[in-house]
């Protein structure tokens, strides 16, 4: 039985699909900004982290193809490409201030640590959307399914695709009852998770941009989150494969047998640490956040 243990490499690259909720509710305040800005920053961090994680000399190795799909009333691909292409073509760079620890010698054999503020340029591939709109998560998963099916047909022996959905809640579209929207989306997500190649089944991970449940990482059962929206996301999440658990432990992410690959009250960047890229096998990811 396939175990989802194929390493993402130049010879066997993987497909990462990121679904980004851009609905009206994402305009609400969150962590000193808005949910949509927070989530969009997370997507840009994910892309940048993967590029840096796979850098070799002057350019990243093409161990991954990334597709970012945004959804509100409509569904559209916001950006896509191999790592080298994405590295060479951000929309712009944003300058942000960041606190770092600077070490210096005290003259007596000791080390002094001092917090200093530096400016850092962050590449931007996806811009936040600030408008009212529905939550056509179903349509986003439909497009993701099409991309995954095509990838699997062309990459029978490569890593099974991974889909990361970053959202604040439940699907709502076509003026339907939200409960019907959830049922339809759960059914489609199950279809996607049943897709497979020689490596294993397609994996769906979820990150909820909401702090109603506090911070919950890789829950073992749905009772660990009480909110309906969180339980819905739990229901459309794959179990963390055993082959991913070494990477999880390496990055201090708690997993147990049967844990689902969903996190609540976080930005989703942690989910990237589960993927075994060629450059990071057996190594920690201390530089990533």
Residue ranges and their predicted role:
Residues 1-289:
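Acidic, low-complexity intrinsically disordered regions
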């Amino acid at each position: 039985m396939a175990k989802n243990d194929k390493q993402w490499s130049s010879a066997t690259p993987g497909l990462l699909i990121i679904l980004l909720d851009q609905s009206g509710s994402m305009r609400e305040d969150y962590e000193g900004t808005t949910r949509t800005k927070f989530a969009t920053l997370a997507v840009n961090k994910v892309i940048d982290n993967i590029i840096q994680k796979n850098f070799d000399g002057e350019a990243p190795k093409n161990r991954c193809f990334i597709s970012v799909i945004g959804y509100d009333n409509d569904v559209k691909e916001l950006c896509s490409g191999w790592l080298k292409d994405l590295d060479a073509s951000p929309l712009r760079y944003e300058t942000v201030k960041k606190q770092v620890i600077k070490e210096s010698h005290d003259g007596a054999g000791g080390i002094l640590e001092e917090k200093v503020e530096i400016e850092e340029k962050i590449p931007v591939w996806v811009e936040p959307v600030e408008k009212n709109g529905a939550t056509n998560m179903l349509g986003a998963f439909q497009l993701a399914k099409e991309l995954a099916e095509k990838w699997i047909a062309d990459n029978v022996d490569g890593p099974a695709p991974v889909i990361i959905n970053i959202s604040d809640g439940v699907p709502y579209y076509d003026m339907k009852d939200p409960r019907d929207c959830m049922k339809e989306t759960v059914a489609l997500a199950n279809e996607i998770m049943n897709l497979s190649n020689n490596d294993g089944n397609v994996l769906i991970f979820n990150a909820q941009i909401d702090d109603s449940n506090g911070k919950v990482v890789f829950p073992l059962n749905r009772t660990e989150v009480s909110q309906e929206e969180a339980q819905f996301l739990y229901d459309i999440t794959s179990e963390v494969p055993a082959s991913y658990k070494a990477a999880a432990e390496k990055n201090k992410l708690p997993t147990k047998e049967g844990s689902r690959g969903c996190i609540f009250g976080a930005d989703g960047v942690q989910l990237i640490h589960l993927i075994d890229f060629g450059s990071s096998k057996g190594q920690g990811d201390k530089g990533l956040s």
